[in-house]
Amino acid sequence: MSSNSINAEARAELAELIKELAVVHGEVTLSSGKKADYYIDVRRATLHARASRLIGQLLREATADWDYDAVGGLTLGADPVATAIMHADGRDINAFVVRKEAKKHGMQRRIEGPDLTGKKVLVVEDTTTTGNSPLTAVAALREAGIEVVGVATVVDRATGADEVIAAEGLPYRSLLGLSDLGLN
């Protein structure tokens, strides 16, 4: 969780919306290969009108002390999070998308959106488990010569992603943890 001051009422409302919309009970296999008795399908919240507005507002608040020009991450989970931040009230912040691999046709880009040359960017994700998805985006951005200032997520599953991201020299913040969703 960020040390920045974020709106506690909005954060509580977001937690309730995610519990209602996105927490699915039943055995599932996570991206890490581990089994869990619930799944947090945060896309059900990031693509919900009210939850999306809260996510954009709260992530802007949580990262207000970070200097970045654009926000994005690995498609698909990061896409609605990035656009929520882009559309939230405040200064202009562009969004971008990082593909898992470059397209084989058209412009053959791996990073889509406005030109990020000389820009500082924030990498985002909907749910962080291992940290591999945001770090895949970080690697692609760094390879393209783009400065990444940090990683932020909506929900952190508390399974070591913070340490993996810190090992890459990046600060990491999350809006919610499992206890906020009644899943500890």
From Swiss-Prot:
GO terms for biological process: 'de novo' UMP biosynthetic process; pyrimidine nucleobase biosynthetic process. Homodimer. The gene is pyrE. This is Orotate phosphoribosyltransferase. Keywords: Glycosyltransferase, Magnesium, Pyrimidine biosynthesis, Transferase. One of its GO terms (molecular function) is orotate phosphoribosyltransferase activity. Orotate binds at residues 129, 157. It catalyses: orotidine 5'-phosphate + diphosphate = orotate + 5-phospho-alpha-D-ribose 1-diphosphate. Catalyzes the transfer of a ribosyl phosphate group from 5-phosphoribose 1-diphosphate to orotate, leading to the formation of orotidine monophosphate (OMP). Pathway: Pyrimidine metabolism; UMP biosynthesis via de novo pathway; UMP from orotate: step 1/2. Belongs to the purine/pyrimidine phosphoribosyltransferase family. PyrE subfamily. 5-phospho-alpha-D-ribose 1-diphosphate binds at residues 99-100, 103, 105, 125-133. InterPro entries: OPRT, Or_phspho_trans_dom, PRibTrfase_dom, PRTase-like. Its EC number is 2.4.2.10. Its cofactor is Mg(2+). The keyword Cytoplasm does not apply. It comes from Corynebacterium glutamicum (strain ATCC 13032 / DSM 20300 / JCM 1318 / BCRC 11384 / CCUG 27702 / LMG 3730 / NBRC 12168 / NCIMB 10025 / NRRL B-2784 / 534).
